[in-house]
Regions:
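Sec-exported extracytoplasmic/periplasmic mature domains
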Residues: 23-31, 58, 67, 71-74, ...
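Extracellular/luminal ectodomains of metazoan preproproteins built from arrays
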Residues: 1, 77-79, 100-101, 151, ...
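Von Willebrand factor A/integrin I-like adhesion domains
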Residues: 63-69, 123-134, 139-180
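DG-centered beta-turn motif at the end of beta-strands
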Residues: 4-7, 18, 40-43, 86, ...
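Eukaryotic intrinsically disordered and solvent-exposed regulatory patches
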Residues: 11-13, 24-28, 91-96, 118-123, ...
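Von Willebrand factor
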Residues: 1-108, 114-121, 135-144, 167
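Fold-core signature of tandem repeat domains
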Residues: 1, 26, 62, 66, ...
Length: 217
């Protein structure tokens, strides 16, 4: 599971909520070299890797790093360049990706504004690679841009503010389960919040709340 976080100047106040979102997500995973792998990247004008998919193999290590993450800063926001960075540097075998082994690749993108570059080409490339992308944006983001980035338009979601991220997590979990079942050649498996759906991939289950949320398709 890869997280791409908008670390531009405009998200400074919302960064703690993004960090908490990642932390809660990681807490639900079965982290290990042969199970779930996690990477976190921040971006603004350029990208900065917090850690790669093969940097840490225990949940405690990852949580320690996530809790200590600091806001990157920078402008303008270039989401297209951030996505391209993932293609070139994160979804690769040398960085720990098992895409070529058939392990589903999940990407969650948190965006706080409109991109100053074009997202079309890298977004299409990620889809061709089979990366299952979910884009979540605040009211300052572009709804059409979120839909382009997401694997399907229905995987794009808008919240009023990053503090409302808990409100999308139940729906996100449900959508991820559906997508993973579609790409996983296993039959007759009863899904539960802790059932491994494929090697190295577990469903995401986080606590929902009642804040406003708008699914874009």
């Amino acid at each position: 599971m890869v997280f791409l976080l908008d670390g531009s100047d405009g998200t400074r106040n919302g960064f703690p909520a993004m960090r908490d979102f990642v932390q809660r997500a990681v807490e639900t995973l079965n982290v290990g070299e042969n199970t779930d792998r996690v990477s976190v990247v921040q971006y603004s004008r350029d990208a900065a890797v917090q850690f790669y998919l093969n940097t840490y193999t225990t949940k405690s290590e990852i949580l320690d790093i996530v809790r200590g993450m600091r806001h990157k800063g920078g402008r303008p926001l270039k989401t297209g360049a951030g996505l391209q960075y993932l293609i070139d540097n994160v979804f690769t075998a040398s960085a720990g990706s098992r895409r070529l082994e058939g392990v589903p690749q999940l990407l969650i993108v948190l965006i706080g504004g409109r991109s100053f570059d074009n997202v079309d080409t890298p977004a299409s490339a990620l889809k061709e690679m089979g990366v299952l992308t979910f884009a979540i944006g605040t009211r300052g983001s572009d709804a059409k841009e979120l839909q382009k980035i997401s694997q399907e338009p229905s995987n794009a979601v808008s919240v009023s503010d990053f503090t409302d991220l808990p409100s999308v997590q139940e729906k996100l979990q449900s959508s991820m389960e559906t997508v993973l079942v579609d790409v996983t050649p296993e039959i007759g498996v009863e899904l539960t919040p802790t059932t491994p759906i494929a090697e190295g991939k577990t469903t995401l289950l986080l606590d929902p709340s009642v804040h406003p949320v708008s699914w874009l398709a």
